Amino acid sequence: MKDLTDNVPALMAEIGARAKNASAELAFASPEAKFTALTAAADAVWARRADIIAANEKDMAFGREKGLSDAMLDRLMLDEARVEGIVTGLRAVAGQEDPVGHVMTEWEMESGLHIKRVRTPLGVIGVIYESRPNVTADAGALCLKSGNAVILRGGSESFHSSGALADCLQEGLRTAGLPEDAVQRVPTRDRAAVSEMLAMTETIDVIVPRGGKGLVALVQREARVPVFAHLEGICHIYLDASADPEKALRVVLNAKTRRTGICGSAECLLIHQDIADTIGQGVVRALIDAGVEVRGDKSIEEIEGVTRASESDWGQEFLDMIIAARVVEDLDDALDHIRTYGSNHTDAIIAEDDAAVARFFQRLDSAILIHNASTQFADGGEFGMGAEIGIATGKMHARGPVGSEQLTSFKYLVTGDGTIRG
């Protein structure tokens, strides 16, 4: 591609045209070719891990200069363990069943027609993301597996890391004899590229934003193409009166402290009043001991180390070692709180009462509902998808972790035998 970085509209038009052409070829690529491309990409990532980490160190220095928060820097950082995780994710996606051409259902009609509904690629996916370089590999792999071309526009913070990973994906495509343009990275930090992508209705079929509330809100507000997204991950954990104390302690600590900067991190703890002075108090003290700032309501602020919560703390995505906590009268009170302040992302109940669990699952409409497990399982890899391109909380098409299967549409194949309609 000729250098068009000083002319962003022309650059994006060129990238879009190349992606559209590549998607037409990739749509009928064999499962074997896609497997080869992904495994070769994984091999390239591991072979170049030192170069990838060196590129990431440039991004980390740039991020510190920009004053990124610790949570954002954590999302940006790559070390050998995280690179190994990227390799594992690529291999996991490679080993999955190819969704393209899968017969979803089929039936016979009295007219003599045989009808099949089969999965097909969406076409061209545009992914706009901020500081997580692993999104480059995850999105590229999932789009390739599902027969879609992808245009990757990473944030300025992850510019070098994303470039190094995209190069590995293109090496995999070359190895498999597939079009390199099936995976393209926008080679400029100019924010005008984002605005161009949002208006590329002729070449992009869906946009997936991965980032903070500001980015996602911008995309949802201005995009002229369909969007798969979630605005915030305001995840709740409700401790029911029937909660097992050991499970409650283990799950809440993991949900809050394992990684605070991800969208599956717990942001609000709701405690049934019957266990507020026992299990609830123990969990709150354990959070404080772990270095978490607990912002509690009137009932909880009496515990040493708790600060009084303000109204703005309810429904806040902290992405930090902070959690809001309050005592609720019962399950229905907890449900009301979640409906009021939640984001339909992921919510969990810790309970041994099957009726309470059933009511929690039935009465909430979050994309992911969890029983007796950490909200940090809200992840495509943990769902057996190998990776995810994002988590969608809308109700159209994809919902929850968006893996390769969710990046397909379908078409009907209708077979007759000289059949006519009377």
From Swiss-Prot:
Gene3D superfamilies: Aldehyde Dehydrogenase, Chain A, domain 1 (3.40.605.10), Aldehyde Dehydrogenase, Chain A, domain 2 (3.40.309.10). The lineage of its organism: Bacteria, Pseudomonadati, Pseudomonadota, Alphaproteobacteria, Rhodobacterales. Catalyzes the NADPH-dependent reduction of L-glutamate 5-phosphate into L-glutamate 5-semialdehyde and phosphate. The product spontaneously undergoes cyclization to form 1-pyrroline-5-carboxylate. GO terms for molecular function: glutamate-5-semialdehyde dehydrogenase activity; NADP binding. The gene is proA. It comes from Jannaschia sp. (strain CCS1). It catalyses: L-glutamate 5-semialdehyde + phosphate + NADP(+) = L-glutamyl 5-phosphate + NADPH + H(+). PROSITE patterns: PROA. This is Gamma-glutamyl phosphate reductase. GO terms for biological process: L-proline biosynthetic process. It is found in: Cytoplasm. SUPFAM superfamilies: ALDH-like. Signal peptide: none annotated. NCBIfam families: PRK00197.1 (NF001221), proA (TIGR00407). The keyword Cytoplasm applies. Its main location: cytoplasm. Keywords: Amino-acid biosynthesis, Cytoplasm, NADP, Oxidoreductase, Proline biosynthesis. Its EC number is 1.2.1.41. GO terms for cellular component: cytoplasm.
